[in-house]
Amino acid sequence: MAQTQSPLQWLATTLIRGYQIFISPILGPRCRFNPTCSHYAIEAIKVHGTAKGCWFALKRILKCHPLHPGGSDPVPPKNDRCNK
């Protein structure tokens, strides 16, 4: 069953998709990571919600610079402590 998005999740992912469609092609491929920072941000928001997902995305974007080696950096899984 598909999980519905909150209005904030929808807004955040729509803004990121807008970046992917309109701005990223102009700038060209620059991300040092796999998945790219914008894909990472969308996945983090879907998995962790808007606030925590945006926090993960911001931390990831701050690491995306020439001095960082980059590489594979998947979204961390959701930690459901209440279900254990």
UniProtKB/Swiss-Prot annotation:
It holds the Pfam family YidD. It comes from the Bacteria. It is a peripheral membrane protein. InterPro entries: Membr_insert_effic_factor_YidD. HAMAP family: UPF0161_YidD. Belongs to the UPF0161 family. This is Putative membrane protein insertion efficiency factor. It comes from Shewanella oneidensis (strain ATCC 700550 / JCM 31522 / CIP 106686 / LMG 19005 / NCIMB 14063 / MR-1).
